[in-house]
């Protein structure tokens, strides 16, 4: 019995000390999650207008979860929506959640508060340039 308890405690200690089940903290170049709504909105607007200045940077942002599926292509898009301080205007950044996830099974309800950390990039689709945080780590309710 004692041997079983000791073995179990060793396994738990080993799991905790090696980080099993814990997302690794990654260095962040631009952390917008702690800034006021107006400052974040302004910064995201700047990212929209001058995306080349941010390419390849790791960005963290807090906002609300949004989802869209193109009715023609059936392609799914996931975004974090950031409102300004007055909540009259909003900007969104698409994200690609690292790993395998299915909507709606692995996602919370729309507009759930979230924090997204990912590599900033852009892509072209149908003649438009879109912002995207790729290889994103997602925390719900934070």
Where are the predicted features?
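OB-fold and OB-like single-stranded nucleic-acid-recognition modules
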Residues: 17-142
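Bacterial N-terminal signal peptides
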Residues: 8-17
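Positively charged n-region of N-terminal signal peptides that target proteins for export
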Residues: 1-4
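Intrinsically disordered, low-complexity regions enriched in Ser/Pro/Gly/Gln/His and often acidic
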Residues: 6-7, 133
């Amino acid at each position: 019995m004692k041997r079983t308890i000791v073995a179990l405690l060793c396994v738990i200690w080993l799991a905790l000390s090696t980080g099993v089940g814990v997302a690794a903290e990654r260095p962040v170049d631009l952390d917008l999650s702690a800034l006021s709504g107006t400052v974040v909105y302004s910064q995201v607007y700047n990212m929209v207008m001058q995306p080349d200045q941010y390419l390849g940077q790791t960005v963290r942002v807090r906002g609300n979860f949004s989802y869209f599926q193109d009715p023609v292509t059936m392609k799914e898009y996931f975004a974090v929506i950031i409102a300004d301080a007055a909540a009259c205007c909003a900007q969104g950044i698409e994200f690609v959640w690292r790993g395998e996830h299915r909507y709606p099974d692995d996602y919370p309800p729309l507009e759930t508060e979230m924090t997204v950390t990912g590599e900033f990039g852009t892509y072209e689709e149908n003649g438009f340039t879109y912002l995207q945080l790729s290889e994103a780590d997602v925390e719900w309710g934070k």
